[in-house]
């Protein structure tokens, strides 16, 4: 559980601000499916 939470949080946590600012539409969907909401 601890590892799964850290992995899920570390992955979408970085591409969120990086891709979220560049491509909110395409980037948001990419990191969203990565492991955040969807």
From Swiss-Prot:
<keyword id="KW-0946">Virion</keyword>
<dbReference type="GO" id="GO:0003677">
    <property type="term" value="F:DNA binding"/>
</dbReference>
<keyword id="KW-1188">Viral release from host cell</keyword>
<comment type="function">
    <text>Mediates ssDNA packaging into virion, it locates to the internal surface of the capsid, thereby displacing the internal scaffolding protein B during virion formation. Protein J binds to and is packaged with the viral ssDNA. Additionally, protein J plays a role in viral attachment efficiency to the host cell.</text>
</comment>
<keyword id="KW-0238">DNA-binding</keyword>
<feature type="region of interest" description="Disordered">
    <location>
        <begin position="1"/>
        <end position="38"/>
    </location>
</feature>
<keyword id="KW-1035">Host cytoplasm</keyword>
<dbReference type="Pfam" id="PF04726">
    <property type="entry name" value="Microvir_J"/>
</dbReference>
<dbReference type="GO" id="GO:0030430">
    <property type="term" value="C:host cell cytoplasm"/>
</dbReference>
<dbReference type="InterPro" id="IPR006815">
    <property type="entry name" value="Microvir_J-like"/>
</dbReference>
<protein>
    <recommendedName>
        <fullName>DNA-binding protein J</fullName>
    </recommendedName>
</protein>
<keyword id="KW-0231">Viral genome packaging</keyword>
<comment type="similarity">
    <text>Belongs to the microviridae J protein family.</text>
</comment>
<dbReference type="GO" id="GO:0019028">
    <property type="term" value="C:viral capsid"/>
</dbReference>
<keyword id="KW-0167">Capsid protein</keyword>
<comment type="subunit">
    <text>Interacts with F protein.</text>
</comment>
């Amino acid at each position: 559980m601890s590892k799964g939470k850290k992995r899920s949080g570390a992955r979408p946590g970085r591409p969120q601000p990086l891709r979220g600012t560049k491509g909110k539409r395409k980037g948001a969907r990419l990191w969203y499916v990565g492991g955040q909401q969807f």
